[in-house]
Amino acid sequence: MDLHSLLELGTKPTAPHVRNKKVILFDTNHQVSICNQIIDAINSGIDLGDLLEGGLLTLCVEHYYNSDKDKFNTSPIAKYLRDAGYEFDVIKNPDATRFLEVIPNEPHYSPLILALKTLESTESQRGRIGLFLSFCSLFLPKLVVGDRASIEKALRQVTVHQEQGIVTYPNHWLTTGHMKVIFGILRSSFILKFVLIHQGVNLVTGHDAYDSIISNSVGQTRFSGLLIVKTVLEFILQKTDSGVALHPLVRTSKVKNEVASFKQALSNLARHGEYAPFARVLNLSGINNLEHGLYPQLSAIALGVATAHGSTLAGVNVGEQYQQLREAAHDAEVKLQRRHEHQEIQAIAEDDEERKILEQFHLQKTEITHSQTLAVLSQKREKLARLAAEIENNIAEDQGFKQSQNQVSQSFLNDPTPVEVTVQARSINRPTALPPPVDNKIEHETEEDSSSSSSFVDLNDPFALLNEDEDTLENSVMAPSTTLREPKEVSEPLRQTQDLDISQKKQGNESTDPARKQFLRYQELPPVQEDDESEYTTDSQESDDQPGSDNEQGVDLPPPPLYAQEKRQDPIQHPAVSSQDPFGSIGDVDGDILEPIRSPSSPSAPQEDTRMGEAYELSPDFTSYEDNQQNWPQRVVTKKGRTFLYPNDLLQTSPPESLITALVEEYQNPVSAKELQADWPDMSFDERRHVAMNL
């Protein structure tokens, strides 16, 4: 036994085994309708499970063989699939018009049947099958790279085909979610990949627009994931008139051994015949013997030589320890090119003048090719670096923003303290609702950054979004009410808490920590929670006054406007009750939910410096506003058509009848988050901000 054969043991199968797989084909008299319903089910994201391969093969048989089972059974496709271990099981149901009628009545298919019952299909066009198959083929060229690269490539191809007027795909097919579904199906379905590749190569007549797209995509898929094979065959194993010659750079003994092993791996790959260029996409046997890491020096030299010849496809990364070898091979190949060109010019030039012209041309050509190649490679590296940085920034921003939101919502939900009945400009009655600034969190913001500050504002203040920070709030001077009752003194602990929070927030604003800079792009965006805050109406509020109430679906509902409460209750004896109901434990109509209370979060509370010890209490005749630009009150119309007087309707000592009706109605019929967004008043953000600053 040759001892050196030990090195190759285990690289070739000695007892080849093929796993048997059953594929269900569907045969009806309404095959086009069934195929369209299969496409609709896939587009809807329904998981067909083990029926997926059969459904896709049914589409292919309908498109290429017009559902002629005899033609398909005698085709090379069926023979290859049988050799690969696939067994075809045909389900015949001539009268079936819906896909769910041909599914076997077995228990594990019951969820699929239930999902298909809700699916409505009105399409019955045969051309839609080819449209779907051609759309799937767009993902083949970059399938082995990853979903992002594959989707980007598919979108570029879609743009090209639309500009050429070949075919136009439905818009909802081009969404990222749908394209990820198709990518996942193509990645896992061997049958679909194989049939598309086989027909893309072998279909020579009867082409329509969809078949030409499939052939074009298959042509771009050749040697996908087999860059080392392509570069070595083109630049290292050079084909000449006298045979195959090794490149001078790989004639050393150590690299020669790698070349011999590579030739053996190539001979194994060549057994797959016409499918060998697609071995990586189809995951054929022997493909694992062609990795770059198995031939490190040969791979580095081949990529360096390919780059010297202007191949930008060779801009992949090699191992760090072989990067210098690659660059050395690149420089050596450039010098060898110049030498060969010089020798050729000496042989073909008839005089010195022609020789000089040819030498100058070839020198310029080599330099131009070299510079262009390096420019393209540097652009690719910059693009990769930008993408990596963008992904990291997005991850960091999402984590920081979600953490800050979670801190606010959790502290807001877990704090059982009832609302203090004092009217203050921005009195902070829950110290836990504002976490102190933490490094590497979104709390590091600038004073103008109203969008990021909206993630941790006082959740009881509907106008808290519209104030950029404490400084803006303190600088906005408001006229006091003409009719004042005796002011209530603010407790000392509350004052200290406010001063502490304000100082902490100012320290966070003045921080120069670099983590703060990565969130500066929030400045140019509208407020993140703008569409989630409460609207200014009094007759369409969706939550109660209790800080512990929360929606079952996890939607943070905004609080309603708060009214004057005639009976003051002791907060210690009557703590707020936490409830999972979006409107709290409303009980009956005569419950506490409809008894208004006064709160600092009332949007009509006059704003003043928080350092003053006074507080104002609203009265029904509170009508003094310092505003010369608009006439108050004004009528506001919401998108649902509700009208109300602003701010008069917010200043009543008892809620209007419309609010009582709306609360009872919406308690019985809870609204969704989308309906909440649709119930905003028809006012722009600047108008809302102007309203808030001029109350």
UniProtKB/Swiss-Prot annotation:
The protein's assembly and partners: Homooligomer. Homomultimerizes to form the nucleocapsid. Binds to viral genomic RNA. Interacts with VP35 and VP30 to form the nucleocapsid. Also interacts with VP24 and VP40.
Biological-process GO terms, alphabetical: viral budding via host ESCRT complex; viral RNA genome packaging
Coiled coil residues, start to end: 316-341, 372-400
Family: Belongs to the filoviruses nucleoprotein family.
Gene from which the chain derives: NP
Post-translational changes noted in the entry: Phosphorylated.
GO CC term (a single one): host cell cytoplasm
Keyword field: Capsid protein, Coiled coil, Helical capsid protein, Host cytoplasm, Host-virus interaction, Phosphoprotein, Ribonucleoprotein, RNA-binding, Viral budding, Viral budding via the host ESCRT complexes, Viral nucleoprotein, Viral release from host cell, Virion
Biased composition, class Basic and acidic residues, residue ranges: 502-516
Motif extent (PTAP/PSAP motif): 603-606
Top-level taxonomic group: Viruses
Chain spans, region Disordered: 426-458, 472-611
Acidic residues composition-biased segments: 529-547
Described function: Encapsidates the genome, protecting it from nucleases. The encapsidated genomic RNA is termed the nucleocapsid and serves as template for transcription and replication. During replication, encapsidation by NP is coupled to RNA synthesis and all replicative products are resistant to nucleases.
Record field: compositional bias (Polar residues): 474-484
UniProt domain comment: This protein can be divided into a hydrophobic N-terminal half, and a hydrophilic and highly acidic C-terminal half.
InterPro entries (alphabetical): Ebola_NP
Protein name: Nucleoprotein
Molecular function GO terms recorded: RNA binding
